[in-house]
Amino acid sequence: MKSNNVSKTLRTCAMGLCGLAAPLSGMAAEPGWPEPVEDRQIFSMVLVDQLEYRGNQGTDTLEWDAQAWIGGDYNRLWLRTEGADQLSGDNDGEWEAQALYSRLVAPFWDFQAGLRYDRLYGAQDHERGFAVIGFEGLAPYWFEVTPALFISQDGDLSARLKASYELLFTQRLILQPSLEINAAAQKVEEFGVGSGINDIELGLRLRYEIKREFAPYIGVSWTNKFGGTADMARSEGERTEDFAVVAGLRFWF
C-alpha cells in the first residue's frame, strides 16, 4: 500500500513538471515573440566634431568635420563630410563626402567600405571619386584611430590616418590632441598632390561641455606639406607650413 502511494506521488510530480515545461518550451518556440535581449534595435547619431573659424597665417577659413550613422550594434551606414572655405580672396574651397557600410569585426573595431567624393572650387574647379576601405576603432590606451585606403576613379592610390585622444581635466573640461597624415602613391597635379607623404596636421583643442551634446572650444593647429605636394604649393604661391588659432563648436544629437 505504501509502495502504491509513493508511485502515485511520483507520477503526480512528473505530470506537474511536464505541465510547467510545456508552456516554457512553447514560449521559446513561439514565432513572432520579441528577442530576450533587445540587440536588434536601430540607433542613430549625428556628430559635428568640428565647426570652426581658423585664423591662419595666410587666408582665414571656415572649416568643418562631421559624421552621422544609423544602424544596430553590428551593421551601420555612415556618412562623413569635411571641408574648408576661404573667407576672403578668391573664395576658394574644398570639401569631401563619404558614404560607408560599417561592420563590427572585433570589440571596439569596425571594418568600413564605401565611396568618397572630392570637390575643389574657386579659381580651380575639379572633382573626383574614390572607393574606400578602412577601419575605425580604439587602439590601446583609448586612442581613437581611423586608417583608410582610397582608390580613385583613375586608379590613383592614397591613404589617410586620423588619430585623437581625450584627456579629461574634469567631467566637462576636455583637452583633445589630434593627428592626421595623408599620403599618395601617385602625383595628381590638379589636386595639388604629390607622391609620398603629402601633409601632416597636428591639432590641440580645449572644449567645455555646457551640455554633453554642446561644447564650444578653442585651440591651435599646425600643418606642414612635404615633397612634391610642397613643391606644387610653392609654385602656386601658397605656404607649405601653417599655424592657426581655431575657435568653434562641437555638438551632437
Regions found by a protein language model. Give the residues of each.
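Detector for outer-membrane/organellar transmembrane beta-barrel domains
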Residues: 124, 128-188
